[in-house]
Amino acid sequence: MSGSSMGRLFTVTSFGESHGPGIGCVVDGCPPGLALSEADIQLELDRRKPGTSRHVTQRREPDTVEILSGVYEGKTTGTPIALLIRNTDQRSKDYGNIADTFRPGHADYCYWHKYGTRDPRGGGRSSARETAVRVAAGAIAKKWLNEKYGIVIRGHMTQIGEVAIPFKSWEHVGGNPFFSADPDIVPRLEEYMDSIRKSLDSIGARLRVVADNVPVGWGEPVFDRLDADIAYAMMSINAVKGVEIGAGFGCVTQKGSEHGDELTPRGFASNHAGGVLGGISTGQQIDVSIAIKPTSSIAQPRRSINKQGEAVTMETHGRHDPCVGIRATPIAEAMLALVLIDHALRHRAQCGDVRVETPRIAGHIG
């Protein structure tokens, strides 16, 4: 299977399946000298791990990370960093009845036609279980970006199903299971998700992730535009069906006099571009939103076919997220960090000595 690696100078190659012995990744290209411990990575993994509330899968995985290489005496050496997360709570018997059938909305049918074989246990390689190692790799990227440039990457949920979530303050995001920036709406979200779960159904979600303090100039036009790579990274996350940067699809109804972000000596007057113009960072906040489809594994009867092409009716039982988007915020943060660190290193390699007389202006003066 190709396609398990991303990045040019900071590369990440992931491996493993949902019900195999473990999952992991190899991070190559991390600059030497970064203070790094398993605890640094674990902080991010704990934000994503399953079983943390009744609104996510009840699979109990500690997601304990092991650093196998690339770190000596607490600092990165510049050599490949191998990370391993062992699976401890597989329940493969839940999938015995679907080994010969294809779950609607899943990759089963596509994997079977492409490879002539598939691992039915939890979706195998196509499972969102794989995203844990992206969060682990992203933790390294976030730490380096913050220490080198002061970049802060964070995300919050903006909508679950029909419930829009207002933004009040970043300080509230870590205090509830929904990554909500509004604590007052949490009871409504609890009630809404309880109703979804009791109906044996699932629901989609939307979230926003931003990066502050990104320098102006990152991005490689034409085909390696910063926003193109961000969209590529976000679309690689399981269940993501749409990506917006800045105004996104909202720009369709905007006029040029509104959408174009005016520059003043004090700073940009707006940020409809989402921090990227011409594929290059403007120095403004990188602003990304993603749409996540409803979890396909539900316990309601659904029509499908088996390997022989015969019609079947199936129910997917097991421990599944009624809203997979709830745990996606740390994943989206990680993917944004991985894109930014790769472009940071590429920019430093080619244009690190470039200086211009024009001062850098403020990101947004409102």
UniProtKB/Swiss-Prot annotation:
Binding site for FMN: 125-127, 238-239, 278, 293-297, 319
Catalytic activity entry: 5-O-(1-carboxyvinyl)-3-phosphoshikimate = chorismate + phosphate
Keyword terms: Amino-acid biosynthesis, Aromatic amino acid biosynthesis, FAD, Flavoprotein, FMN, Lyase, NADP
Recorded coiled-coil stretches: none
Main enzyme class: lyase
Pathway: Metabolic intermediate biosynthesis; chorismate biosynthesis; chorismate from D-erythrose 4-phosphate and phosphoenolpyruvate: step 7/7
EC annotation from Swiss-Prot or TrEMBL: 4.2.3.5
GO BP, sorted A to Z: amino acid biosynthetic process; aromatic amino acid family biosynthetic process; chorismate biosynthetic process
Entry-linked Pfam families: Chorismate_synt (PF01264)
Described function: This reaction introduces a second double bond into the aromatic ring system.
Database matches in PANTHER family: CHORISMATE SYNTHASE (PTHR21085:SF0)
NCBIfam families assigned to the protein according to its UniProt record, in alphabetical order: aroC, PRK05382.1
UniProt name for this protein: Chorismate synthase
Organism name: Chromobacterium violaceum (strain ATCC 12472 / DSM 30191 / JCM 1249 / CCUG 213 / NBRC 12614 / NCIMB 9131 / NCTC 9757 / MK)
